């Protein structure tokens, strides 16, 4: 979005009506930032989403960017390079971040829940472009400070509480911007409040005593390689976060009411350095055994104990006599083989006896069993037919005998 030099007002808080299409209000019950957005009776709109940055190809502002409207309001009517950068910073969400997301820096739970979960703090591909632009702008400001305003830029110590007087020229405006930039660094939120664990394994560079914190503003950016692009894409494993370390080295914390864990995790004061940190996501291991012991009722516990004892006894029996079970199986197998052999021998002898009873195969020692059975069947049928025939003959003979007896009786009676 191009920035025009003829602006109607020096105050860079743009009218809300002009950018109203880019904001939205959520429902009352679904607004998660309602507690942080409400100050008295004023409601602040949420910051635009990541789609707005991608749509207008804007560079995302670094997190924790403080407001520097007082110094910019006192600048000249024609915005200089520093004024344009400040306008870009505020337009990209510097003040909106401070008013919408970080309304209460002391509320650690709110900062952790909002900064880590919001899409603007998760880091995306525009972070590298932002670092590059900031590096170029800072180099230009340092060169202009050395040429035009060495006296104003070399002032050490904390910044004055009131607004500074308006500068005389563009060089003084750049030096004043650097001075306000170093002063606003003290208002930034400590990264240890947001991330209670170490953010980077590399130690920051130490600042020489008496140096201006704004002059030491550097960019610690690794070269853009394929591995860096792959790391940025793998957002499930790592989150790319751009943070600002505090620049006041002589300032020491005197609060004794902080917790021991926060004191242990709080990093040392270092120069104002724009650096990229990788935060590992720790996932709970749901496969781990439960730490608490489950208490069962007395009856159920007794039943479980008895079941365990019986199972242990059966396991002991199985484990104590493996050889005995093997020997028993061998004996059973041997007995089965002996009985099977006896059965076969008896069957063979039966076939031999049957063969001897059949006249057709009696002399054939090599007659197969099928032939023996077939001939035996035929022989049985023939014997049965002979039996029926003999029974019929016997009946005829019995009748003949009865007739002869009756005839004999008649002859005896006739003689008498």
Curated annotation (Swiss-Prot):
Residues 212-227, 245-259 have a biased composition (Low complexity). Residues 390-411 are annotated as: Leucine-zipper. CDD domains: bHLHzip_c-Myc. The keyword DNA-binding applies. Transforms avian and murine macrophages and fibroblasts as well as murine B-lymphoid cells. GO terms for molecular function: DNA binding; DNA-binding transcription factor activity; protein dimerization activity. Efficient DNA binding requires dimerization with another bHLH protein. Residues 156-169 have a biased composition (Pro residues). Residues 144-174, 203-267 are annotated as: Disordered. Keywords: DNA-binding, Host nucleus, Oncogene. This is Viral myc transforming protein. It comes from Avian retrovirus OK10. The lineage of its organism: Viruses, Riboviria, Pararnavirae, Artverviricota, Revtraviricetes. Residues 228-240 have a biased composition (Acidic residues). It is found in: Host nucleus. Pfam families: HLH, Myc-LZ, Myc_N. Residues 331-383 form the bHLH domain. This protein is synthesized as a Gag-Pol-vMyc-Env chimeric protein. The sequence shown here corresponds to the Myc homolog fragment of the chimera. GO terms for cellular component: host cell nucleus.
């Amino acid at each position: 979005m191009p920035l025009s030099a003829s602006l109607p007002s020096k105050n860079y808080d743009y009218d809300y009506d002009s950018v109203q299409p880019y904001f939205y209000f959520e429902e009352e019950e679904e607004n998660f930032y309602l507690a942080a957005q409400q100050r008295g009776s004023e409601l602040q709109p949420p910051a635009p989403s990541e789609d707005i940055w991608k749509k207008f190809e804007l560079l995302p502002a670094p997190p924790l960017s403080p407001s520097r409207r007082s110094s910019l309001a006192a600048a000249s009517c024609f915005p200089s390079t520093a004024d344009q950068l400040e306008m870009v910073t505020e337009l990209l969400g510097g003040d909106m971040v401070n008013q919408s997301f970080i309304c209460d820096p002391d509320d650690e739970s709110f900062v952790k829940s909002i900064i880590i979960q919001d899409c603007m703090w998760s880091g995306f591909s525009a972070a590298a472009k932002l670092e590059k632009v900031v590096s170029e702008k800072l180099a230009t400001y340092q060169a202009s400070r050395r040429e035009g305003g060495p006296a104003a830029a070399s002032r050490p110590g904390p910044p004055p509480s009131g607004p500074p007087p308006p500068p005389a020229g563009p060089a003084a405006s750049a030096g004043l911007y650097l001075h306000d930039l170093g002063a606003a660094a003290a208002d930034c939120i400590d990264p240890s409040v947001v991330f209670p664990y170490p953010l980077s394994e590399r130690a920051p560079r130490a600042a020489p005593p008496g140096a201006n914190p704004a002059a030491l503003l550097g960019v610690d950016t690794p070269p853009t390689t394929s591995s860096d692009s792959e790391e940025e894409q793998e957002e499930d494993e790592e989150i790319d976060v751009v943070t600002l370390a505090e620049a006041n080295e002589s300032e020491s914390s005197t609060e004794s009411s902080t917790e021991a864990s926060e004191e242990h995790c709080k990093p040392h004061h270092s120069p104002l350095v724009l650096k990229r940190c990788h935060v590992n996501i720790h996932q709970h291991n749901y496969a781990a055994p439960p730490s608490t012991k489950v208490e069962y009722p007395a009856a159920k516990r007794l039943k479980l104990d008895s079941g365990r004892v019986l199972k242990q006894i059966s396991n002991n029996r199985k484990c104590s006599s493996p050889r005995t079970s093997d020997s028993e199986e061998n004996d059973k197998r041997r007995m089965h083989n002996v009985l099977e052999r006896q059965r076969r021998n008896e069957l063979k002898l039966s076939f031999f006896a049957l063969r001897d009873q059949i006249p057709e195969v009696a002399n054939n020692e090599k007659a197969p069993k099928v032939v023996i059975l077939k001939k035996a069947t035929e022989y049985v049928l023939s014997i049965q037919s002979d039996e029926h025939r003999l029974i019929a003959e016997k009946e005829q003979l019995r009748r003949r005998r009865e007739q002869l007896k009756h005839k004999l009786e008649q002859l005896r009676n006739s003689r008498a």
